[in-house]
Structures are given as C-alpha cells and as structure tokens.
C-alpha cells in the first residue's frame, strides 16, 4: 500500500526534490559570490579623514573599513566588540598617530603591529611639516592644514602602490587626481581666508584643534617666522576635549576676546557647547560677541573630508568678515 502511494505521488516528490536542488544551487552560487567579495584585500582606516582619502585612491579594488566614524571623539575612543576582528582581517591599518589614538585599548593593538601605517610619524621622518605641541604633547590635527594633508595622501598612495602592486597604475592615477583637487582646495582656502580683515583674524574654538589651520591660513609670513601666529587662536580646552574646563580657563579666553576685540566664537560639532556659551555670557560689558551660526568640524567630518574642509573655510571666512571666492 505504501509503495502504491509513493507511485501515486511520485511526480509531486520529484517536483519537491527539484525545488530543493534549486535552493542548494542558489545557496552555493550566493556563497561563491560573497566569498569573492570577502576575498578582497581589507584596508582599515582609523578615522574618516584617512578613510575618505584611501577610498578615493583604491576605489572598489579593496574593501575599505573605517573604525572611528560619526560624532565619536577619536581622542577618547575605546575599542568595542568587533574592532579586534576588523583589525585582524585587514592587511593594512592606516592611523593618524601623533597621539590621536591614545586610549589604552587602541595602543595595545596598534603599537608594534607590523600592519600599521603611522602617517604622522612617517611625515615627520620625511620633514613634511613642522610639528606643533602643547604642554609637551604633539598636536595630531594635521588634516586641518590641507598642505600637510596633501603629503599624507602622497604617503597613503605610496604605501598602497607598494603593498598592492597589481593595481599600482590605477591607484597612482587616482592619487594624482585627488592630489590635484586638494592643491586647488588649498589655494582656494588661502585666497578666501586672506580676504578677512587682519584685525578680525582671531579664531576662538571649543578645543585646540585649529592651530595648524591658523598657522597656514590666518597668519602672515612674519607671524609664522616669529611664532606669533599662535596669538591668532584660542580655546578653553587643550588638544584633547577630555579634561574638565575650569573657571580660570573660561576667564583666560574671555580676556583674550576682550584684548583682541573678537566678535564671534565657533562651536564645534561634537563638543559640549556649555563652555563657549559661558564665555559669551561672561564677556565684559560693551564687548559685542556671539556664537557662529554654524559649527566647525575638527575631529570628525560633515559628509566627507573634502566637503568638511570647504565647510570650515567658508564658515570661518564668512563669520570673520571675509569673502568666499569661487
């Protein structure tokens, strides 16, 4: 009786077996497709300022990953679940260096790691820029000076061409394109920020992230030579926005604002705004001062690194009374 039922429904059974076979084939094909994607070389960039440049150089030839993204403060970032795996699968790890990635968990995985490309250290070794420091600590914010970051992109391209030679010609061509755009942006920034009246070229921000920017774009040749360019910028917090701000810090900035007749202070996108609001409210009677209409981006990006640089230049130029040139 059982075999009679089997014969009766054998066409149904055959159909089910055929369908199952299709699923198996489909699954295998899908697996092969995913495997192909996963087999691409993985490149890990520690932040978006690096990632956006590496991605432009490599295109889709590699799998690009960014570790610290969004509004997260890179100064205080501690590794989370999955970060160790991202580092393990990556052939190259680009970091900014100069003390930016200074948390204990990051140092543990970066220091002594043969896959790590420390951009700051490499540029210093090649005398690509003059290092700034505060209280004995190096200033890591080199990406705010497009002229310095051009050297970093050259270093990224050099490493990528050497490590992934099968795409060397393509990477070099992409790098030349991006470097040309960056040189145009640098010249544009110099010309636009030069339209700011000299008496207005004072930059007050949330933390000390714009020293390289100030030295490059808001100072005269004489000020850069003498070191007096440092008088062009001020902030209540140091290089890393982690420490508590004291009343003394606030009053120091207030005195600076009054001494230089500063009319506007700039918030930063990821920082607590209370300190600068207190500074504005503490300003002496008769000192007209306000918060800028738009925040600056220091340790993160708005859309991408290149648009962020343009945003900062436009915002500072317009707020300080200059004219943004096209």
From Swiss-Prot:
InterPro entries: AdhesinB, Bact_metal-bind_prot9, Lipoprotein_PsaA-like, ZnuA-like. One of its GO terms (cellular component) is periplasmic space. GO terms for biological process: cell adhesion; metal ion transport. Its main location: periplasm. It holds the Pfam family ZnuA. Part of the ATP-binding cassette (ABC) transport system YtgABCD involved in metal import. Binds Fe(2+), Mn(2+) and Ni(2+), with a preference for Fe(2+) and delivers them to the membrane permease for translocation into the cytoplasm. PANTHER family: HIGH-AFFINITY ZINC UPTAKE SYSTEM PROTEIN ZNUA-RELATED, METAL-BINDING PROTEIN HI_0362-RELATED. Monomer. This is Metal-binding protein YtgA. It comes from Chlamydia muridarum (strain MoPn / Nigg). The lineage of its organism: Bacteria, Pseudomonadati, Chlamydiota, Chlamydiia, Chlamydiales. The gene is ytgA.
